[in-house]
Design a protein with these regions (language model features):
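Conserved G1/Walker A P-loop phosphate-binding module
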Residues: 1-111, 139-140, 144-145
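C-terminal-of-GTPase-core extension/linker across diverse P-loop GTPases
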Residues: 2-6, 11, 17, 144-352, ...
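Short, intrinsically disordered, mixed-charge
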Residues: 22, 54, 90, 94, ...
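Glycine-rich, flexible loop/turn motifs
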Residues: 23-31, 38-40, 48-51, 80, ...
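Amphipathic alpha-helical transducer elements in NTP-driven molecular machines
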Residues: 32, 46-49, 62-68, 82-95, ...
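Conserved Switch II/interswitch segment of TRAFAC-class P-loop GTPases
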Residues: 40-45, 72-82, 93-156, 169-182, ...
Length: 365
């Protein structure tokens, strides 16, 4: 999974990126300190996988990972090449979802590119640039469909009509993900890789005094309402606090520091969970003496397709899957004990994978 971290200059996105990846990219207090995208890969914390590691002592331990891309800041006119806009737009297209960092605190010592804190205005600035870029893409798609239809392929008449409707929606300053249409039409639109179709987490960057009570912050309330109207998520976070936590290497010291602050889990953990929820993702686990590994799949994935994540031969020659829920395995202590209690199931091609399934796939090619 790849998440693009975006936001106006000086809203805290590079500070957040530094905290969650320990990448050490610049986070200075001036516009465009992030000129090129900085990429960091972080492991997805999973206590289930760690338990399996302690049981099997494998040669290799492979958690699921998320790739975070810190992309250069935007200003008005970015879709037309102002600031660093063109580079931003090309880099954001490759992401699975967007983490849009929004400033939700007042601080006279930290300059704001627009002069004052106004999270909805800031969101509108970036979203408008994304909409403008999508308009250009949709216009080209309509032209291409019209030409194909005139060439005799009448199937493209429907495509032209669908994208004309979307174009009208975008020209009203609305996001593609809020377009009301049939599932078939949306499936067609999804083939266009539009920026405003991407799922978005609005990371509301609060100050240290507010992050534990975000609902009391009017800025956050506004961001949350907007996110809900778009079918997205608003996540309260304090980038500065996350940076302080990330500087602590000792786990016990880190836990003590978080307890003193009243923070139960890090912003990274909450961001990862929010990403999985928003994109409809789950993890299944494989375990043995060679490797313990977590695999990320979409909710609703059937066993053969999950097996294909490991290797295409597993899907092609799928026979069955030996499955046990992690909690059942942990309760029993060992796989042998779980088998003795009849908790290990044999599942076929129609089995829908569940989060936390511990699986052994049987195949023949």
């Amino acid at each position: 999974m790849k998440l693009g971290i975006v936001g106006l200059p000086n809203v805290g996105k590079s500070t957040l990126f530094n905290a969650i990846t320990n990448a050490g990219v610049p986070a200075d207090n001036y516009a465009f300190c992030t000129i090129d995208p900085n990429v960091g890969v972080v492991s997805v914390p999973d206590a289930r996988l760690e338990w399996l590691r302690d049981q099997h002592h494998p040669k290799k331990f492979t958690p699921a990972v998320i790739e975070f891309v810190d992309i250069a800041g935007l200003v008005k006119g970015a879709s037309k090449g102002e600031g660093l806009g063109n580079k931003f737009l090309s880099n954001i297209r490759t992401t699975d979802a967007i983490v849009h960092v929004v400033r939700c605190f007042d601080n006279a010592n930290i300059t704001h590119v627009e002069g004052a804190t106004d999270p909805l205005r800031d969101i509108d600035i970036i979203n408008l640039e994304l909409i403008m870029a999508d308009i250009e893409m949709v216009e080209r798609r309509v032209d291409k469909a019209v030409k194909a239809a005139k060439g005799g392929d009448k199937r493209f008449n429907r495509e032209a009509d669908v994208f004309r409707g979307l174009l009208e929606h975008l020209n009203e300053g609305k996001l593609a993900r809020t377009y009301d249409c049939s599932p078939d039409d949306m499936a067609l639109i999804a083939t266009s890789d539009l920026l405003t179709l991407k799922k978005t987490i609005y990371a509301a960057n609060l100050d240290e005094n507010s992050v534990n009570d975000p609902e009391s912050v009017p800025y956050f309330q506004k961001v949350k309402a907007l996110a809900e109207s778009e079918g997205c998520l608003a996540l309260p976070i304090c980038a500065k606090l996350e940076a302080d936590i990330a500087e602590l290497d000792d786990p016990e010291e880190k836990a003590m520091f978080m307890e003193e602050l009243g923070v139960q889990e890090s912003g990274l953990d909450r961001l990862i969970q929010a990403s999985y929820d928003l994109l409809g993702l789950i993890s299944f686990l494989t375990a043995g003496s060679d490797e313990c590994r977590a695999w990320t799949i979409k909710k609703g994935t059937k066993a053969p397709q999950a097996a294909g994540k490991i290797h295409t031969d597993f899907e092609r020659g799928f026979i069955r899957a030996e499955v046990i829920a992690f909690e059942d395995l942990k309760t029993c202590g060992t796989l042998a004990a779980a088998k003795a209690k009849g908790l290990v199931r044999s599942e076929g091609k129609e089995y829908v994978m569940k989060d936390g399934d511990v699986v052994n796939f049987l195949f023949n090619v």
